[in-house]
Amino acid sequence: MENVELLIEALPYIKDFHSTTMVIKIGGHAMVNDRILEDTIKDIVLLYFVGIKPVVVHGGGPEISEKMEKFGLKPKFVEGLRVTDKETMEVVEMVLDGKVNSKIVTTFIRNGGKAVGLSGKDGLLIVARKKEMRMKKGEEEVIIDLGFVGETEFVNPEIIRILLDNGFIPVVSPVATDLAGNTYNLNADVVAGDIAAALKAKKLIMLTDVPGILENPDDKSTLISRIRLSELENMRSKGVIRGGMIPKVDAVIKALKSGVERAHIIDGSRPHSILIELFTKEGIGTMVEP
């Protein structure tokens, strides 16, 4: 009976979400744990079969760092963004497109999902430009050169719409090009937010390795289960948001301001976290609303 009650609880959410598009960002932590990846993909396949149109964007940070170290390259980050020289860019593209994307697509196929892997280059899905980062150093503002780190100039969502309309699950790696053919490494959180905005998605779901937005970043028990966009912006400006959570929060803020209805930041390592967040009243992570 308990299982039946859970299904009944999910019914209004399933009706509300039917035929809507959701962009789901899978973090690099899932790539190094086959059980987490398998469980995550099963959840997304279930979303597909109840009539939701999922779009998956993936990172691959841990695997990139591991491969870099094998080549004698030392990973370096600035505010959660990987500094990417030419050698690093070659490793990034090899790992994200050649290994991680293929692994996710294969996992979908094994679990009954019709997935298609693509990068931001394919069909000019994402046209990128070099990212210019400005930081305060004392009283001065300095420009930090991140190398081949890019940002989205614009998104052409047509190829994703074609795939969704024909029953496929797009799986996107955050490698993109500018119109001159230069290849860039884009932050996967940012790419997920930009694609969600271009599609006017119902939801943007960020899977990470922390419970969600924390009132105190050093205390996992301080989870904020529901927060307004204005409150999140205030936390960001006060420096409460730190490290790898910065690009996630920035992507969420931009997406909601661009028409995405809701965003969720949840712990993707917890079993069935997507289903619990979407189909139960309590949820499991943080929901951000306008």
UniProtKB/Swiss-Prot annotation:
Its EC number is 2.7.2.8. It catalyses: N-acetyl-L-glutamate + ATP = N-acetyl-L-glutamyl 5-phosphate + ADP. One of its GO terms (cellular component) is cytoplasm. Pathway: Amino-acid biosynthesis; L-arginine biosynthesis; N(2)-acetyl-L-ornithine from L-glutamate: step 2/4. The keyword Cytoplasm applies. It is found in: Cytoplasm. Substrate binds at G60, G61, R82, N185. Coiled coil: none annotated. InterPro entries: AceGlu_kinase-like_sf, AcgluKinase_fam, ArgB, Asp/Glu/Uridylate_kinase, NAGK-C. GO terms for molecular function: acetylglutamate kinase activity; ATP binding. The record marks K25, K248 as: Transition state stabilizer. GO terms for biological process: arginine biosynthetic process via ornithine; L-arginine biosynthetic process. It comes from the Archaea. It holds the Pfam family AA_kinase. It is an enzyme of class 2 (transferase). Keywords: Amino-acid biosynthesis, Arginine biosynthesis, ATP-binding, Cytoplasm, Kinase, Nucleotide-binding, Transferase. Belongs to the acetylglutamate kinase family. ArgB subfamily. PANTHER family: N-ACETYLGLUTAMATE SYNTHASE, N-ACETYLGLUTAMATE SYNTHASE, MITOCHONDRIAL. Catalyzes the ATP-dependent phosphorylation of N-acetyl-L-glutamate. This is Acetylglutamate kinase.
